[in-house]
């Protein structure tokens, strides 16, 4: 490489075009519910069953909502699980697939982005959320864990739903 005058520094590919990011400033109110956003393909490894187990531990009267965006083979199972459980049905909205441009509105409403994947390197949605200044909750086992400090997100070990 040195013969070609090329730096030996590794090349980093950024999956999120920060020039394309729109202003998603959002007004926060201390009186409103906390909005969590999760986006991705609805498959087992995304950890949604694990997330739903953790959500069922939150008291019913807590003011929050979880907006789940994406499609896949697990979507109907997740919708049924929400419908069958009162603690989830009032708080979790499984929206299915939405147009990419609609995600801007979802990010604008979100207070926290959740990436509960049990096997994921670094998802593009994680980078998108971070680029919009949204704090992230994710597992402390894969690529996403290297992107955070205590000011930008929360990591959990992924050993139990109680920890989550």
Tell where the protein language model's regions lie, with residue ranges.
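Nucleotide-activated donor-binding/catalytic signature segment of Leloir-type glycosyltransferases, i.e.
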Residues: 79-98
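Donor nucleotide-sugar binding/catalytic pocket of nucleotide-sugar-dependent glycosyltransferases
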Residues: 1-23
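Short hydrophobic beta-strand element within catalytic cores of glycosyltransferases
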Residues: 135-138
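Conserved acidic donor-binding segment of nucleotide-sugar-dependent glycosyltransferases
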Residues: 150, 154-161
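Aromatic "clamp/platform" in nucleotide-sugar-dependent glycosyltransferases that forms part
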Residues: 118
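Short alpha-helical donor nucleotide-sugar binding micro-motif in glycosyltransferases
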Residues: 97-98, 105-110
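Conserved donor-binding/catalytic core segment of Leloir-type glycosyltransferases
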Residues: 29-46, 52-55, 67
């Amino acid at each position: 490489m040195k013969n070609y005058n090329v730096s030996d520094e590794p090349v980093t590919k950024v999956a999120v075009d920060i020039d394309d990011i729109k202003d998603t400033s959002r007004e926060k109110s201390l009186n409103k519910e906390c909005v969590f956003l999760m986006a991705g393909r609805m498959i087992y490894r995304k950890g949604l069953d694990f997330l739903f187990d953790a959500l069922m531990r939150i008291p019913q009267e807590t003011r929050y909502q979880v907006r789940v965006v994406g499609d896949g083979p697990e979507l109907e199972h997740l919708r049924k699980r929400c419908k069958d459980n009162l603690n989830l049905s009032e708080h979790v909205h499984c929206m299915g697939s939405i147009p990419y441009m609609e995600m801007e509105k979802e990010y604008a409403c979100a207070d926290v982005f959740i990436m509960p994947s049990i096997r994921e390197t670094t998802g593009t949605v994680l980078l998108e959320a971070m680029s919009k200044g949204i704090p992230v909750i994710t597992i402390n086992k894969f690529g996403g864990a290297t992107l955070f400090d205590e000011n930008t997100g929360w990591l959990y070990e992924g050993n139990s739903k109680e920890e989550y």
